[in-house]
Design a protein with these regions (language model features):
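Collagenous Gly-X-Y triple-helix signature in extracellular proteins
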Residues: 1-164
Length: 164
């Protein structure tokens, strides 16, 4: 049960593909999606680098729908003391903790073949890959996306009008 093997070879990849192929996103909107490589390098709980170097040491083929790698969660914290995976400082001023949701990351544990990092109520935890959790969907879009209004903030999110 390797979480990552020869690309994002797992149930999570299958889920992303099924979301993309479904009618959740209309084809007119999918035209603005930009496929990107995903960083899926494994990391140990003791590694403190949050630059993306560890996770980006291995990448998938480009995909249109994905989720975040662990380093992206760590870097979202505005607390300068967020330097270790298990540090409570990483939950401070972190956009991803606004709803205290539970969700998977793309990052697997380097020391096992079956554990994956997930965010659980604002904390980083290691969980067996056969457990259930939510996905925080990430879609990259090109700069030509027709914005109706908004500034991208939590209070005034972008409103997209892809029918223009």
């Amino acid at each position: 049960n390797n979480y990552y093997q020869n690309g994002l070879s797992s149930r999570i990849r299958d889920k992303f593909n099924s979301i993309y192929k479904s009618d959740i996103y209309p084809d007119e909107l999918k035209a603005y999606f930009i496929p990107r490589e995903n960083c899926v390098g494994k990391r140990s709980i003791t590694e403190n680098d949050n630059s993306g170097t560890i996770e980006c040491s291995e990448k998938t083929e480009p995909t249109s729908i994905s989720t975040i790698a662990l380093y992206e969660y760590l870097r979202a914290s505005l607390d300068p003391n967020c330097t270790e995976i298990e540090s409570e400082s990483c939950t401070n001023y972190n956009y991803f903790n606004s709803n205290l949701e539970n969700f998977w990351t793309l990052t697997a544990d380097k020391d096992t073949s079956y554990k994956v990092y997930k965010i659980s109520s604002g904390s980083v935890t290691l969980s067996s890959a056969n457990n259930t959790s939510n996905l925080k969907i990430v879609v990259n879009v090109n700069g030509d996306l027709p914005l109706e209004s908004g500034n991208g903030s939590k209070d005034t999110p972008y409103i997209i009008n892809y029918t223009k």
